Every structure is written in structure tokens, then in C-alpha cells.
Amino acid sequence: MSDFENKNPNNVLGGHKATLHNPNVSEEAKEHSKKVLENAGEAYDESSSGKTTTDDGDKNPGNVAGGYKATLNNPKVSDEAKEHAKKKLDGLE
């Protein structure tokens, strides 16, 4: 029986990642979780805070700009935050 059968694969992988950090889990269970993650193509670094090692941390510039533009148009945002967003947007162009 597959670990993913009739289940959301992301939830299953998240559970296996949590297993690796749980001090109350046996070494046997941790080894099983490592194998499942490896078989699923998830490069997982136990020393990280739950992030896969394939995540390079780059942000989509379009999304970043969109966030700053939204800040400028949000009436609930302070003038100081809007000024910061404007400076950041000017730097992106």
C-alpha cells in the first residue's frame, strides 16, 4: 500500500518531515520517513527548519513589485510603509 493512496501528497510529505523533527519518534520511524521523502524526490535536510534543500530562496520579481504596489494602494497602510514601498519599487525599475 502506498503512503499516498487516497491522501493529499503534500500532507503526507509534511507528516514525514514532522516525524524527522519529533523527539518522541523512534529511529525506525525516522528512517522510514527519510526513505519516503527520498523516494518522493524531496531533498530534505534535517538541520533546516522544515525547508527542502531545493528551495533557493529566490523571489519572483513580479510578485514582489505587486506586493509593493498593493501596499501603496492600501488605505490601512501607514504613510511610512507606503514611502518604503515606493522606494523599493523605484529600485526595482
Swiss-Prot record:
Region (2 X 30 AA approximate repeats): 7-89
Single GO BP term: sporulation resulting in formation of a cellular spore
Repeat found in the keyword field: yes
Annotated Sequence repeat ranges: 7-37, 59-89
Start-end of Basic and acidic residues biased regions: 27-37, 77-93
GO CC terms of this entry: cytoplasm
A Pfam family: Con-6
Lineage top rank: taxon: Eukaryota
Membrane-traversing stretches: none
Key words of the record: Conidiation, Differentiation, Repeat, Sporulation
Protein name according to UniProt: Conidiation-specific protein 6
Organism taxonomic ancestry: Eukaryota, Fungi, Dikarya, Ascomycota, Pezizomycotina
